[in-house]
Structures are given as C-alpha cells and as structure tokens.
Amino acid sequence: MTRSHEFADGIGATEGAAGVVERGVTNEAVSKRVPKRSRASAKKAGSSFERLIADHLAAVVDDRIDRRVKTGSQDRGDIGGLRHMGGRVVIEAKDYGGRLMPGPWIGEAETERGNDDALCGLVIAKRRGTTDPGDQFVLMTVNDLTALLTGNRDHINQEEK
C-alpha cells in the first residue's frame, strides 16, 4: 500500500509498504533506483558497514571497540566494547541501502540489550548518499536515551512497577 504525503513546502512524498518516505520521489522511482540484493550481497554490505562503524568508533572513542562474533538467538549486538558511565552499550548496525525500518530494528536492539544486560541499545543505520561513518543515522528510544544520559535504567524499572 502506498500513501501520499504533502509537506508544508508543497513538495510531495510517498510512503511504501516498508514505511520509507522520500520527498519528491515516487515509490516506483525508488524501487527502480535501489537494486535488489541477493542474500550474499546483503550480508557483505552488512559486514562492511559494521566494520566501517566499529573502526570509526575505535579510532574516535576507544580502541577496544570492535565487531562482535554472531551468536544466533542470544546475539548481543553487532559492535562490542562500547561503554558509557560504566554500562555496556549495544549497537545494532543496519545497511538496508538507505531504507529505514525503525520499529523492527529498535526491537532487535532491545532484545540484544537484554541479552547483554546492557545500559542501552541503539541502531546505527546507513544513510543514503554518504559513506562517512560520522554522518550515519542513530536510532534509539527515549528510554534508552535517558538511560544513556543518566547512566542507569532506574526510571524504566520504576515505570513498570
């Protein structure tokens, strides 16, 4: 199902089944522009993106940050070694050719945060049009942002009681 949007500046946009919104571009144009990936090419793109982000964070933040080994259903995120205020931070890296799927990705990051007993989980998503690791998108819930800023998840545990 495709829905049309019009922004205040009069530029139209379409939203496709995946929830991707592009200003001034029809879904048909997007699907023609984004080539279909095979499973192998998708895995390669994902691995390359994880390496790009891990290397950037290791150079800028802490040299102990690196890609994690995949562990199946008990996955603890794509990038490990990142800590803030004594708590682990789980990073889920996503390269879907510039498409954003925040709901499922945030859910995956939350599952992996729980598996790792981490302070917060976040998603770093590939931004179309740039390969600069510092220009990629970061997605997280407000609860995870608050945990990151305060160094604990106490506010979340209190809300659940």
Stretches with model-predicted labels:
Residues 2-161:
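Catalytic phosphate/metal-binding cores of nucleic-acid and nucleotide-processing enzymes, i.e., regions
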